[in-house]
Amino acid sequence: MHSLQAKILDPRLGTDFPLPQYATPGSAGLDLRAMLEEDTVLGPGQTLLIPTGLSIHIADPGLAALVLPRSGLGHKHGIVLGNLVGLIDSDYQGELMVSCWNRGESPFTIAVGERIAQLVLVPVVQAHFELVEQFDESQRGAGGFGHSGSH
């Protein structure tokens, strides 16, 4: 398991509400909570930037973090991430924020401390461009969308 530096920015985190944790031994994501001042209604089509009360510093350029939606919120209530996926670079040290979007047809109340997203650490491979005049031939070539089959 990797070590991850974290700062608590909201004193309710770790006292009134648990720190981010893995729900099961096999979980890939740490739950992030809505550290709002009060329960907030998100109307259909609305977006809201929600603080998590936490900042992290990954420090290792070979790692990044992804902020991903919680499957139940999206499937049952239409609550997804406004930016679809949040990317946290290894050198970012600010508060983790979650952009929530209600793509459903009904208002949804986000309760203070509710689990609204998950944080997943992923490996990163940084690349540099090697400029060439032509590529070596491949079987696919420049075939794009739908090129490899109809399904």
Swiss-Prot record:
NCBIfam families: dut, PRK00601.1. CDD domains: trimeric_dUTPase (cd07557). Gene3D superfamilies: 2.70.40.10. Pathway: Pyrimidine metabolism; dUMP biosynthesis; dUMP from dCTP (dUTP route): step 2/2. Keywords: Hydrolase, Magnesium, Metal-binding, Nucleotide metabolism. Belongs to the dUTPase family. The keyword Magnesium applies. It comes from Pseudomonas paraeruginosa (strain DSM 24068 / PA7) (Pseudomonas aeruginosa (strain PA7)). Substrate binds at residues 70-72, 83, 87-89, 97. This is Deoxyuridine 5'-triphosphate nucleotidohydrolase. The gene is dut. Its cofactor is Mg(2+).
